[in-house]
From Swiss-Prot:
It is found in: Chromosome, Centromere, Kinetochore; Cytoplasm, Cytoskeleton, Spindle; Nucleus. Residues 327-350, 487-506 have a biased composition (Polar residues). It comes from Candida albicans (strain SC5314 / ATCC MYA-2876). Disruption phenotype: Short, often misaligned spindles with an extensive network of cytoplasmic microtubules. Cell cycle arrest in mitosis with unseparated DNA. Inviable. This is DASH complex subunit ASK1.
Length: 594
C-alpha cells in the first residue's frame, strides 16, 4: 500500500537522491559527483599552495628584501654625498625620474617614416624625369639618397649619433632603447652626400646645410638695425633677452637603465641664475647671519681694579669712595629698619659669641679694612629675642678683657620642663606637681641681673619686647606646646625635652601641667625603695627669694603611683642608692639642685 504525505511541499532544495528515478540517469550523477570531488580536491590543493607561498614569502623573501632595502639605503646615503659634490663642482642640478616606454614599436615607426620619405623622393624624381632637365649629378645624388634611405633602418638600431640626440634633447646611451627621429628631422630635407669632384662647391653647400646643434649664431646686423639697436631702450631689451637666453640653457638627459616597461633617466640642468634683487637680499641676510654678534664694548682696565696688591691702593680713589658710600647707606638703612621694629620674628634667638666683641669690632673697624677684605667678611644678622634669655649688649669695648666666668654667669639658666606622671585611679586633689611659673623665672632673672651688676658694672639689664601673638605663631623656632597661665602671662619658651602630657578622660578642664625633674624622679624612686621621703636642703648663701624657689623645685611630697607599698623591694634594689657614689655624692646633689 502506497502512502502519501499530507504536509505541504516546501520550496527548499533537497540534496537527497530520489530512489524512484530510472537507472539510466545514474552514470550522469556519478559523473557530477566525481566532478564535485575533483573541484574540492583542486581547491584544497590551491589553498595548500597559497599557504606555502605565504610562508615562503614571509619567512624567506621578505627578510631578504628588507635586508636589501637596508643595504641599498646605505648606498643611497653614500651616493648623496657624491651627487652633491658633482652638482657643486659642475654647477648643475641632477634629477632622476622614470619615464614609461611608448606602446608603438620604434622599428615600425622608423619603417613608416622611411616609406613616407621614399614616396616624397620618388615624386620629386618623377617630376624631374618628366621635364627632361635633370643632370647626371642630380641622378647620382638621388641614387645616393636612395642608398642612404636603405641604410637608415639599419643605423637606427645602432649607437645613436651625438648631433641628432642633441637636437632631440637626448644624450648618447648604451641601453637597448631605439631612438626616434624628431618631427624637426621630418620637416627638414634629409642630408645629401656631396660629390668630391667639386671640392669648393661641396664646402659651400656644407656650410649652408642646417646643422643639428641648438645654439645657432644670429645673423649679422645691418647698418639700419645697428642704428635702431643703439637706443637705450633697445639696449635694455637686448640685455634682458640675452639674460633670458643664458637662463634657458639646454637640459641633457641620460638613460641609466631600462626595466620592463619604464626608462630610468637622469636630467642634467644648470642651476637657475638668481636675480640681482634676490641676490642682494640673500647676501644681506647671509652677512647678518654669518657676522659675529654685536657685543658691548669691552671693559677698560684701570690700575686700581684687578691689582694684586690692594694695600697700595690710594684711599682717595673715586671707585673706593663710591663703594664705601654705598655700604654706609645700606648699613644705615638696615640699622633704621631694626630700630623701627620692622623685624617679623623678633623672638628668634640671637646667635653671637659670648663676648660679642667680634661682631662689634667688625662693624666698628669696617672702614679700616680694604675693599677686597670687606667684601669677604660680612657681619652675621642681628636678631633680638626676649623669650630665649637675656640679650647681652657689649657696646662698651673697653672691658673686653673681662673674665669668661662673668660672661658665663650673665647667661640665663635654661629651665627644664619635666615629665608628667598622673595617677588614673587617684583623684585630682591628691596630685601635686612642681611647675616653673613665669614669676619664678622673673625672680631668677632679677637675681642673675643683680649678681652681674655687683661683679661687672658694664653689663646692661635685659629688656623685654612685647610681641604679637600672630608673629609668635608663625615663628618656626618657638615651641607652641606651652599653655598660658590664668594671669594671661606667657610662660618660658625654652625647648621642652621628653615632654609627655597625660590627659584625664574624666576632667578636661585641667589647665596646669604636673611636671617633675629627672632628679626628683630618681630621688623618689630611691626613697620609695627605702621607705623614706626625700628632703632637700638649701645650700644657697644669698638667702634670696630665688633660693626659696630652687628649694621649692627640689622639695617634693610624692605618693606611690600604684598605691601599694614597695618596702619589700628595698633589699633587692639598694645597690642603686646614692650611698655607693662615694666622693661623687655631693657633686651629684649639687647638679640635681641647680
Amino acid at each position: 500500500m502506497k502512502r502519501y504525505s499530507i504536509a505541504p511541499t516546501s520550496s527548499r532544495r533537497k540534496s537527497a537522491i530520489d530512489a524512484t528515478l530510472p537507472e539510466s540517469n545514474l552514470p550522469a550523477r556519478q559523473i557530477l559527483e566525481q566532478l564535485d570531488q575533483d573541484t574540492t580536491f583542486v581547491l584544497q590543493e590551491i589553498d595548500k599552495n597559497i599557504s606555502r607561498a605565504n610562508t615562503v614569502i614571509n619567512d624567506k623573501i621578505k627578510p631578504m628584501i628588507q635586508e636589501y632595502a637596508f643595504q641599498s639605503w646605505k648606498v643611497w646615503e653614500n651616493t648623496g654625498f657624491w651627487k652633491h659634490f658633482f652638482e657643486q663642482s659642475a654647477n648643475v642640478e641632477l634629477d632622476s625620474y622614470v619615464e614609461p616606454i611608448n606602446e608603438v614599436n620604434p622599428q615600425n615607426n622608423f619603417l613608416l617614416l622611411n616609406e613616407i620619405e621614399k614616396n616624397k623622393q620618388k615624386g620629386r624624381y618623377e617630376d624631374s624625369r618628366g621635364s627632361n632637365k635633370v643632370n647626371q649629378a642630380n641622378n647620382d645624388e638621388n641614387n645616393d639618397i636612395d642608398n642612404d634611405e636603405k641604410e637608415e633602418p639599419e643605423i637606427a638600431f645602432k649607437k645613436p649619433n651625438l648631433r641628432r640626440l642633441v637636437a632631440d634633447g637626448n644624450t648618447p646611451t648604451w641601453s637597448t632603447e631605439h631612438t626616434k627621429p624628431s618631427m624637426k628631422s621630418i620637416q627638414l630635407s634629409p642630408p645629401k652626400r656631396m660629390q668630391t669632384t667639386n671640392f669648393t662647391g661641396g664646402l659651400a653647400r656644407e656650410n649652408t646645410k642646417l646643422t643639428d646643434s641648438i645654439t645657432l649664431e644670429p645673423p649679422a646686423l645691418s647698418a639700419e638695425t645697428r642704428a635702431v639697436t643703439s637706443s637705450p631702450h633697445s639696449r635694455h631689451y637686448q640685455n634682458q633677452h640675452q639674460r633670458l637666453q643664458s637662463r634657458d640653457s639646454p637640459i641633457k638627459i641620460h638613460t641609466i637603465r631600462q626595466s620592463l616597461d619604464t626608462y630610468h633617466r637622469v636630467s642634467i640642468s644648470p642651476k637657475k641664475l638668481k636675480t640681482p634683487i634676490r641676490s642682494t637680499r640673500t647676501s644681506r641676510i647671509e652677512s647678518i647671519l654669518n657676522s659675529s654678534p654685536i657685543l658691548p664694548e669691552p671693559p677698560v682696565l684701570q690700575s686700581e681694579i684687578g691689582s694684586e696688591t690692594p694695600k697700595y691702593m690710594s684711599s682717595s680713589s673715586p671707585m673706593k669712595k663710591q663703594q664705601q658710600q654705598q655700604r654706609e647707606s645700606l648699613n644705615f638703612q638696615s640699622d633704621n629698619d631694626q630700630q623701627q621694629g620692622l623685624q617679623r620674628f623678633p623672638n628668634t634667638p640671637k646667635y653671637s659669641r659670648l663676648s660679642g666683641s667680634s661682631v662689634n669690632s667688625l662693624l666698628s673697624n669696617k672702614s679700616n679694612l680694604s675693599d677686597d677684605e670687606d667684601d669677604h667678611i660680612n657681619p652675621p644678622p642681628q636678631l633680638d629675642s626676649d623669650n630665649h634669655g637675656v640679650v647681652i649688649d657689649n657696646s662698651d669695648t673697653n672691658n673686653n678683657n673681662g673674665d669668661s666666668s662673668d660672661d658665663l654667669a650673665a647667661l640665663p639658666v635654661p629651665e627644664l620642663n619635666t615629665i608628667d606622671f598622673k595617677d588614673k585611679n587617684s583623684n585630682n586633689n591628691n596630685k601635686r606637681s612642681i611647675q616653673s611659673t613665669p614669676r619664678s623665672s622673673e625672680k631668677k632673672r632679677r637675681s642673675i641681673n643683680t649678681k652681674n651688676t655687683n661683679n661687672n658694672n658694664t653689663s646692661a639689664a635685659a629688656t623685654a619686647v612685647v610681641v604679637d601673638d600672630d608673629d609668635d605663631r608663625e615663628n618656626v623656632f618657638l615651641d607652641h606646646s606651652y599653655k598660658k597661665t590664668p594671669d594671661n602671662q606667657q610662660s618660658n619658651n625654652s625647648t621642652r625635652f621628653f615632654s609627655t602630657g597625660g590627659s584625664n578622660n574624666d576632667n578636661h578642664t585641667e589647665t596646669q601641667d604636673n611636671s617633675k625633674s629627672f632628679s626628683q624622679i630618681y630621688d623618689e624612686a630611691i626613697s620609695k625603695i627605702r621607705g623614706k621621703k626625700t628632703t632637700s636642703q638649701s645650700n644657697d648663701q644669698n638667702g634670696d627669694e630665688d633660693g626659696d624657689v630652687v628649694m621649692s623645685l627640689d622639695m617634693t611630697v610624692t605618693k606611690d603611683l600604684t598605691g601599694e607599698p614597695t618596702k619589700d623591694l628595698s633589699k633587692d634594689l639598694t645597690e642603686n642608692s646614692t650611698t655607693d657614689l662615694g666622693p661623687f655624692r655631693e657633686r651629684w646633689k649639687k647638679l640635681t639642685r641647680k
